[in-house]
A protein has these predicted regions:
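Single conserved hydrophobic/aromatic residue that forms the stacking wall/gate
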Residues: 1-12
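Short glycine-/polar-rich loops that comprise or flank the Walker A/P-loop
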Residues: 8, 45-48, 194
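N-terminal catalytic cores of NTP/NDP-binding nucleotidyl/phosphoryl-transfer enzymes
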Residues: 13-63, 170-177
């Protein structure tokens, strides 16, 4: 196990970890409760949480848990929602410097199409991507290249935070397991000494079993 193979100094040292939230609305909802409660507990235990606002990925739309294509928001809507979520996160995590707030628009918007295909597309296997539950469940009804590419963008997020902020753990709902492992694999392929991990947690669902 991870703990069994770790030295005591590794287990107790201060860790940086992150959880992302796409600005699909201007407020958190009950479905965000569990992952951000866990992130808050890490903060209270002395670790450093990084909250990633998906200004870039939110402009694309996460296909997880959906049977139909998302309606794309305008750039103004995404920015408004991102700003609103940022203020909510400050209230939850404080403004004492014990956490970091970032927006993936800052790096995703700077990647050209050619760089995306050359630097990242070559590192992802289509067969593996098609096998992910979120994609496989949409093959019959159809999924656009836009939403199909979402998992690559989220992987880039983990790589960027790993390299820039020393983040070694990503927290996400159970439906994000495939995206998280993609990010870990991208880090493995692009960093010689890599230590990146993922933690998935049960989803809080509606009475009919669908996501909030």
């Amino acid at each position: 196990t991870l703990l069994a193979s770790s030295a005591a100094s590794d287990v107790y040292k201060r860790q940086s970890l992150y959880c992302g939230i796409d600005p699909t609305g201007d407020s958190m909802h009950i479905g965000h409760l569990i992952p951000f409660m866990i992130l808050k507990r890490f903060q209270l235990a002395g670790h450093h949480p990084v909250i990633l606002i998906g200004g870039g990925t939110g402009a694309i739309g996460d296909p997880s848990g959906r049977t139909t294509e998302r309606v794309l928001q305008t750039a103004d809507q995404v920015k408004h929602n991102a700003d609103s979520l940022t203020e909510q996160m400050k209230k939850l995590f404080g403004e004492d410097g014990s956490f970091t707030m970032m927006n993936n628009y800052d790096w995703l918007s700077k990647i050209s199409l050619l760089d995306f295909l050359r630097d990242y597309g070559k590192l992802f296997n289509i067969n593996t991507m098609l096998a992910k539950d979120v994609v496989a469940s949409r093959l019959e009804t159809g999924i656009s290249f836009t939403e199909f590419s979402y998992q690559i963008l989220q992987s880039i997020d983990y790589k960027m935070l790993y390299e820039k902020c020393g983040v070694q753990l990503q927290i996400g709902g159970a439906d994000q397991g495939g995206n998280i492992t993609n990010g870990i694999e991208l880090i493995r392929k692009t960093n010689e000494n890599h230590e990146a991990f993922g933690l998935t947690i049960p989803l809080m669902l509606k009475a009919d079993g669908t996501k909030f």
